[in-house]
Amino acid sequence: MKNGLKASVVALFFLLAASSASAATNSVDTVTYESNSDFFDGQVLQVGYTSNFATDKINVYLSESKIESETGAVADEPITFDVSHQNTYAKYPTQDTGLESITGWDAVKKTVSSKQELWDWTTTNCVDTNDAGTFTVDGYGTTDVDARANRWFDTWTGQYKYTIYCWQRNDYYGAVADIGSPDEVFRTEWRLQAGDKNPQTAVITNGDGGTGVTSNLGRYAKVSWEGSLSTGENPPLVDDEYALHSNDYEGGWRVISESRYSSYQSFVQNNADDLLGEWGAGLTTESHIESEMNGKAEEAASEFTESPLSDSEILDSSFQNGAFKLDMERSLMYPEFSVYVDAGENGYATISKPVGKPEIVSTSGAEFGELGQGTISVEAENVGDSEGSFSARTDSCGEYFSGNSLQDTQRVSPGGTASFDFRVTFTSTSMTQSEFSDQCEVVVEDTGSGNEVSASVSVTATQEDECTEGDETKKEKQVNGETVDVIMSCTNGLKLEEDEVCSADEEARYIDDDVQYECRDKDSPPGGGGGDPWTIPGLGWQLDTPFGGMEKALSGNAGALTWAQLLLSFIGFLAGFALVGVKLGKMVDGLATEFIPLSDAVVRLGIGLVGGGMAFMAVYQLVTNPLGFLLTVVGLLLTGYLYLKGTTPDINL
């Protein structure tokens, strides 16, 4: 047995036969080596054939050299296909459509003495010949049978009597069925042989199958009907034929004329009752009306010799599944078959082809964070005897991971290698930061042979904290060997990112719900403040500035605490303005007006604004500290109490 992968053989035949020519065809048009079939493991040898339109027999011989020259595959023995002994016919099924049976007729007469006897005898012994007619007996209702009755007086008995005239059925010609449209049926004998091995044979008919149906051709091959059968002639249509069923006929069936049957039915329905009336009136005889009715029945049941089905065979004699068989004059035309031959390691035919064989020699995993992506790689070596065409794909990845499997095919010489890279992404619904590790399976395949190998590659991804956009928090990290605070900000609702890194002398301090965190000197007074701190030049002292609180107050976003801080600071401003502007203003009035040409009021206003501003800043520094705020409020309440106590006059009653 040759080295390499074993193959399955597919023989695809287009049997194109016209008229009844009997020339045999023994060549093929195409031989290709393709992918696996659905029936046997291994590669597929496809043999395609197109007829010269003048054959009803196929006798194809595929030598070892023919197979190798067309495909590069090596065969240990020749393969032959024979298709012969065609038999084609049209099958006409019968159909029960509720048609009335054909029978003989007896005209009967009966004399009774009462209306009750008339009713009883008529409904029991007479038949209906006209579906639309009814027979009425006064005082006893109606019946759907057809009958005539004469009432007369019997002088011998002195009573009125009734004479009844009606029809009864006698001879049974048979049940009538419709004939359906014909189905073409063919029968061919197949024979396949590899070298001197036992031949594989089968009889293929489209009556047993149809498009997409597969039959066994012995143990090691299959024949599939793939096309539509035609002989180049249309089976005769049945436009004036019915089928009559009775055990008296050969095969249980007889072909009759539809028009004769319709004439019989029309005569019975339209004339049977009138014939009874003529007989009862004495205008004709019993034998005459029976001859009229039975003549129509015999004519309807007679064989329709003018029909093309008069020479047909009976395929099924039962009434439920009856069928006629009509042989066709022409041979098959345009049937299409596929033959699949097992040529694997333990198969029927021995065929092999050198191919590439991949082997994964190295892999490279990936580590990345959420919203990012990583790259995994595999390197495959061709350890086969022939050039290979390698492709790779990510077959599957663990939970939360997905891989991009689109890859270009690479041709690899024996002993050569090819590298394949795959982009891997990570998505998780977890809300907390954690690390996920899993694997992706990568498959490398030689496209020519179907040989494939796989390897598992490690992937690791870090799940970031999910957050509310705009929120800030603080964390610690090492910078130059020192632990510092880092202000983290949520900018996109998915992850926290570094917003500001504090120095070693600073700390991330929470200010309020709007400002949130700021880097402040560790030695600065505690408290939030309302904006960026101001550093006093030369001293390095940091002061809380009120501008942030004022901005919030003006925009309507200030809370109760901010309003209280600004109000207390404004009281400090008024106190500073009054004390400094009045007291200190008097001291500098003369000095200022001596050197500066300004009025005393303007000087006092300027000095008061400076003093008030300094008082405002001093109070603001105090009240932005929680303890200072509390002491300020308590001090104001105590001062107010003492002021009221000292200024309120005593009232003596």
Swiss-Prot record:
Signal peptide segment: 1-23
Annotated GO CC locations: cell surface; plasma membrane
Role summary: Exhibits fusogenic activity. Mediates cell-cell fusion in mammalian cells (bilateral fusion).
Protein name: Fusexin 1
Cytoplasmic side: 581-600, 643-653
InterPro entries recorded: Fsx1
UniProt topology in membrane: Multi-pass membrane protein
UniProt keyword annotation of Transcription regulation present: no
Region called Fusion loop, residue ranges: 154-159
Domain notes: The extracellular N-terminus has 4 domains; the first 3 are structurally similar to fusogens from plants, C.elegans and viruses, while the fourth domain is unique to archaea. Domains I and II are discontinuous. The fusion loop in domain II is stabilized by a Ca(2+) ion so that it protrudes from the molecule.
Topological region Extracellular: 24-559
Highest taxon, organism lineage: Archaea
GO molecular function, one term: metal ion binding
Positions of disulphide bridges: C126-C166, C397-C440, C467-C490, C502-C519
Spans traversing the lipid bilayer: 560-580, 601-621, 622-642
Places the protein is found: Cell surface; Cell membrane
Name of the gene encoding the protein in the UniProt record: fsx1
Gene Ontology BP terms: plasma membrane fusion
Oligomeric and partner information: Homotrimer stabilized by interdomain contacts and numerous Ca(2+) and Na(+) ions.
HAMAP family found in the cross-reference section: Fusexin_1
Keywords, in A-Z order: Calcium, Cell membrane, Disulfide bond, Membrane, Metal-binding, Signal, Transmembrane, Transmembrane helix
Primary localization: other
Keyword Disulfide bond: yes
